[in-house]
Amino acid sequence: MTREEARAFALRWLPAWTGNNPSELAAYYSEDTFYCDPGIPNGVKGREALLGYFQKLLAQNPDWVWTQIEGIPMEDGFLNKWHARIPVGSKIVECVGVCFVQLDSNGLIRRNEVYFDRTELVKEISKARKPAT
């Protein structure tokens, strides 16, 4: 995969993370996909299980926005350096992280592992959930 191909894929795929449409997002993944992120470090296997996770995750974060900073080609895919703007209560948490994206022969994601420091995000979620005193 070239840098241009990685960028083109990210321009189609990353917007599907916004707007709480888990079926649209899951359609980018193969039937036997593997996905993990800091919230599920052991990951999920298979599109059906991933869809269940996405239904919960996207419902909690319908307005977050993910954009690519850089795509670095690797075997069968790319390393995606990304930026996320995540609304939490009245604050916007900004995160930079990486994930690797490996595609199958049909151009669907067969492996997606997401890594970032979620310290600030967890702190803001905890503050937003505390009842006002």
Name what the model sees in each region:
Residues R3-E4, P15, P22-E75:
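A solvent-exposed, acidic/Ser-Thr-rich amphipathic alpha-helical stretch
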Residues A59-Q60, R85-E94:
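Short, cysteine-centered beta-strand-loop-beta hairpins and adjacent loop/turn segments enriched
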Residues F54, W66-I72, H83-A84, V96-Q102:
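Hydrophobic/aromatic beta-strand elements that line small-molecule binding cavities or substrate pockets
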Residues V96, F100-I125:
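Short beta-strand edge/turn micro-motifs at domain boundaries
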Residues M1-E4, K127-T133:
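Basic/polar N-terminal segments that are highly enriched at the extreme N-terminus
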